[in-house]
């Protein structure tokens, strides 16, 4: 609601550190809620950034610990990384 209000007032809105799991970066990925956010951002032409390009033991980390520093193959990318990759490629 606050973002809708800001947009109506002509203020710039950028969604940073968004994700589809609990605010602490863990828990199950809630695809229903994530897709609602994606739809809202697309509808309002709001840019976004997802987190985290890391290999930590948390849901929001996009890489497995075995991933190389660059040139990631699908096997190096965790579930959340694939979700974000798909959303970005769909733009």
Annotate the PLM regions.
Residues 8-91:
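Substrate-binding cleft of secreted/luminal carbohydrate-active enzymes
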